[in-house]
């Protein structure tokens, strides 16, 4: 095991002796974060040998059902592949009541090469093509989301949250409304603080076109893989901080039939 890997997890455990568990995370092709929760002492084994996940993880649709046509499911025995740590992604998760940690993983085959369906591998192939042209893509990801009341309405449909400032259910549709940022200042401050603790370069927060609709932007990065890793982690962070504040967050394109849709996770790029 390389010295830098040993240093990373040992330093983390030394700095957080009260950590009670570590979430081992990997994103599927839909950007859904999946994983396992292990005790802190398991980190040594994870950093040394990796941890097994089923390869069919990359054959799941948005509902979690395996698409057998991918050839990654039962047809090949639904076997496992090794997942190894992505450097510099081991961090705490400050939205949990107890001290918890998380680590982002990537999947490799028996020869320690990326599994063909691994989205990080697909992206890396695109990056290599840019390198062949002596170009460097620089990107920043923008994430739009809705904050929701943790409770559904009487018809079991999602509904906007109640503002802690006004005591009323949100109905504002004013884009760039500073008052909306003030009303949800505690939540947005929690997102900013958690992002800073995790080393995620979150930048600007914007109130969007519908009640409880916001956008958080990441800074530009010349490391495209890192930028996308940070986007995946920011989505988890936003959902966690929302829950911490008694709400839910969704990145669903259109949770309400009569309100503005959410733009897809968009990228600003230059080369």
Show where each model-derived region lies.
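ATP/Mg2+-dependent ligation/transfer catalytic cores
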Residues: 1-204, 224-233
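Short, conserved phosphate-binding/catalytic loop or strand-edge motifs used
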Residues: 143, 208-216
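A short, contiguous, amphipathic alpha-helix enriched in charged residues
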Residues: 195, 233-246
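Flexible helix-coil linker/hinge segments at domain or subdomain boundaries
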Residues: 200, 244-251
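Residue-level detector of conserved catalytic or cofactor/ligand-binding positions
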Residues: 261-271
